[in-house]
Curated annotation (Swiss-Prot):
GO biological process: one example: lipid A biosynthetic process
Keyword Lipid biosynthesis found: yes
Coiled coil: none
Role played: Condensation of UDP-2,3-diacylglucosamine and 2,3-diacylglucosamine-1-phosphate to form lipid A disaccharide, a precursor of lipid A, a phosphorylated glycolipid that anchors the lipopolysaccharide to the outer membrane of the cell.
Reactions it catalyzes: a lipid X + a UDP-2-N,3-O-bis[(3R)-3-hydroxyacyl]-alpha-D-glucosamine = a lipid A disaccharide + UDP + H(+)
Any one annotated GO CC term: membrane
Name the UniProt record assigns to this protein: Lipid-A-disaccharide synthase
Family: Belongs to the LpxB family.
Pathway(s) it belongs to: Bacterial outer membrane biogenesis; LPS lipid A biosynthesis
One example GO MF annotation: lipid-A-disaccharide synthase activity
Organism the protein comes from: Helicobacter pylori (strain ATCC 700392 / 26695) (Campylobacter pylori)
EC code(s) of this entry: 2.4.1.182
Keywords linked to the UniProt accession: Glycosyltransferase, Lipid A biosynthesis, Lipid biosynthesis, Lipid metabolism, Transferase
Length: 360
């Protein structure tokens, strides 16, 4: 029975992990940080946004690192997913402790956007790098392979036309995001009802919020919305979506649902990020769309969907995006994007894990 140490801190990483586990034998045992049993910590305990938040939780993060390194002694291999600021140093410490321990990194950091030196660190400390973007492989020397994109495993239904019945609102999965984005989305929903007439409004809530007091998280205005824990189903049924940046933007693009990306960070965090990251776009769909059109990812001229970021974000801007988006063009180009990513990744990653464990 192989034991796998997992570090999956993000909601999206845990969705990808769940799909991966369906492609693995049932006798694989998982330990570490993820949504499931035998966990050291829940990913919810790592819900940190911004540079100040990291400094405030530094003691906890160092403690978690130390415990994960110790836990690695029990594991036959290590699976690291996304969250490079936590996982790259973790890989280094585990490899120093046991140079023969096999480490796989699945969902690579965005070295094409910033901190390109991380590519060398990953190749030094990891044994296999699973790239989920075709253009990522070019940033590595030898250990990276394009394995497909996990969303193409997880999404079960794709739109056949641009029609939809609902408006979907996705204000993020972190409390700080929700606090900033949800009030804007509420105002946009109310203005749309005044201007366009009533349409069903669906609020997509992260699945790990089940059992929590949603009114305490979102406020009294949550009663204006239908609640859904199924992002893919809700996006498939939607006419249009209002989405905080993140994996959900790519999910909408692959499903074929028109949307606007909306994001507002703390001013200091935004200014620091601007100094470190040189990108025109922050939306994954726009970044991939640049690559699809042979442009530098995140810096190209082509745009699949509108982005409203920081001081450009307003209720009026959200309404304008809803009214003016060329939905037929968007739908046609979203099909091209799906073809670009080709196929899912779970089966390939499962096979590579078996290889690292000497089971093939």
């Amino acid at each position: 029975m192989p034991t796998i140490l997992v570090s999956a801190l993000e909601a999206s990483s845990n969705a990808h992990l769940e799909e991966l586990r369906q492609n693995l034998p049932e006798d694989y045992r998982f330990i570490g940080v993820f949504e499931g049993k035998e966990v050291l910590y829940s990913p919810r305990e790592f819900s940190i946004m911004g540079f100040r938040d990291v400094i405030g939780r530094l003691g906890f993060l160092l403690k978690a690192h130390k415990e994960m390194v110790q836990l690695a002694k029990q594991a036959d291999m290590v699976l690291l997913m996304d969250s490079s600021s936590f996982n790259i140093p973790l890989a280094k410490k585990i490899k120093k402790q046991d140079p023969h321990k096999k480490i796989m990194y699945y969902i690579l950091p965005q070295v094409w956007a910033w901190k390109k030196w991380r590519a060398k660190s990953l190749e030094k400390y990891c044994d296999f790098l699973g790239a989920i973007l075709p253009f990522e492989v070019g940033y590595y020397q030898k250990k990276a392979q394009y394995v497909g994109h996990p969303l193409l495993d997880e999404i079960k239904h794709y739109k056949k036309d641009i029609k939809g019945e609902t408006l979907v609102f996705m204000p993020g999965s972190r409390k700080s995001e929700i606090a900033k984005m949800f009030p804007l989305f509420v105002k946009a929903a109310q203005m749309l009802e005044q201007n366009e007439g009533f349409k069903r409004r669906v609020l997509v809530v992260p699945s790990f919020f089940k059992g929590l007091d949603l009114k305490a998280l979102y406020g009294e205005d949550i009663q204006l919305f239908e609640i859904s824990y199924d992002a893919h189903k809700s996006l498939f049924e939607a006419e249009f979506a209002f989405i905080c940046s993140g994996t959900a933007t790519l999910e909408a693009a692959l499903i074929g649902t028109p949307f606007v990306l909306a994001y507002r960070a703390k001013t200091m965090d935004f200014l620091i990020a601007r100094m470190l990251v040189n990108l025109h776009y922050i939306g994954l769909a726009n970044i991939f769309y640049n690559a699809l059109n042979n442009e530098t990812p995140g810096l190209g001229e082509s745009q699949l969907h509108p982005e409203l970021i920081q001081h450009f974000l307003s209720v009026e801007g959200l309404l304008k995006a809803y009214k003016e988006m060329d939905r037929e063009r968007y739908f046609k180009e979203s099909l091209r994007l799906r073809e670009y990513l080709k196929h899912g990744s779970a089966r390939k990653i499962a096979n590579e894990m078996a290889f690292l464990l000497n089971l093939t």
